[in-house]
Amino acid sequence: MKTQMTIPYFTIDAPYELAYRNNGTSSPARPHTHNALEIYLTMSDLPDVLLDDTVSSVSKGSLIIIPPHHVHQLFNQKLTIYERYVLNINSDWLYTVLGAGSGLMPYADPAFSPAILRLSPTGLTGLCSQLDHYLQLHPQPSLSA
């Protein structure tokens, strides 16, 4: 007999949420999906990232781009410390800003597959600097991932 897993669906109501985390958890997030584009910058190696039906090892300094409504789980090891930046952008809000069908943000389209991009050291340093600067000006502690 096959067991079917129910995938939780979360709704991101805010236009966007940005958070920096450098911690572990006693109960990692299960595989899930939501209505937001998720951009995840990992500063730690992730041994078993689930994106749709594929599990991959992702090295630190990688950018993981997950279009809305794609099943994912980025880490599942209890009490392991993971350093990361997480940006969730509500897809409805993004389409309002950019214009649906504009082609300006293809990864906001659920038809696209998740992507893993390895950043150059210079690109990684620059992106972290910009994210840190934004977080200093606009702290958003509400994101729990």
Where are these regions (language model features)?
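Short hydrophobic-aromatic micro-motifs
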Residues: 64-66, 87-88
